[in-house]
Design a protein with these regions (language model features):
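Chalcogenol-based redox active-site neighborhoods
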Residues: 1-110
């Protein structure tokens, strides 16, 4: 299914990161998204940095599709904040847009 998704989706086709399948269900059980009764997993997207730290995760029931452009936006935000410590990407942030420096002065203003 990931192979077909990669071949048919213009956004996914450009992805330069792995789309992981899990035929043994080892990963889906480890991430607690496996549905034992059905023998399948919820739709899960996990962005994990090179140190093994989960930077973003999104889990949907199988009736709800994922938005690849939003996943890519979150991936770019994770990459940006890793390269720019002390900066925060606000909601709907796009690559090249302004970021924030966390401060008590921001509370209630964004």
């Amino acid at each position: 299914s990931h192979k077909v998704w990669h071949e048919t989706s213009p956004a996914v086709g450009k992805a330069k990161f792995p789309l992981v399948g899990d035929p043994t269900h080892k990963l889906t059980r480890a991430f607690d998204v496996h549905i034992d009764e059905e023998g399948l997993a919820l739709r899960g997207t996990f962005v994990i940095n090179p140190d093994g730290v989960i930077k973003t995760l999104e889990i949907h029931s199988n009736e709800i599709a994922r938005d690849v452009s939003e996943t890519l936006r979150k991936l770019k935000a994770a990459q940006f904040t890793a390269a720019n410590p002390g900066q925060v990407c606000p909601a709907k942030w796009k690559e090249g847009a302004k970021t924030l420096a966390p401060s008590i002065d921001l509370v209630g203003k964004i």
